[in-house]
């Protein structure tokens, strides 16, 4: 059986990258929460 995680850097950036997060309202909320939490990395 094929495993679910097949890593690809391009897809990783395109779906979870900073610019993608900034594009939507929800994504900006994610970044805001991560800033408040004090995350070292806000996005991939």
UniProtKB/Swiss-Prot annotation:
GO terms for cellular component: ribonucleoprotein complex; ribosome. One of its GO terms (molecular function) is structural constituent of ribosome. Keywords: Ribonucleoprotein, Ribosomal protein. The keyword Ribonucleoprotein applies. Pfam families: Ribosomal_L34 (PF00468). GO terms for biological process: translation. InterPro entries: Ribosomal_bL34, Ribosomal_bL34_CS. The keyword Ribonucleoprotein applies. Belongs to the bacterial ribosomal protein bL34 family. PANTHER family: LARGE RIBOSOMAL SUBUNIT PROTEIN BL34M (PTHR14503:SF4), MITOCHONDRIAL RIBOSOMAL PROTEIN 34 FAMILY MEMBER (PTHR14503). This is Large ribosomal subunit protein bL34. The lineage of its organism: Bacteria, Bacillati, Bacillota, Bacillota incertae sedis, Caldicellulosiruptorales.
């Amino acid at each position: 059986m094929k495993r679910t995680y097949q890593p690809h850097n391009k897809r990783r950036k395109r779906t979870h990258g900073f610019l993608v997060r900034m594009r939507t309202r929800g994504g900006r909320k994610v970044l805001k929460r991560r800033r408040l939490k004090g995350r070292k990395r806000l996005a991939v």
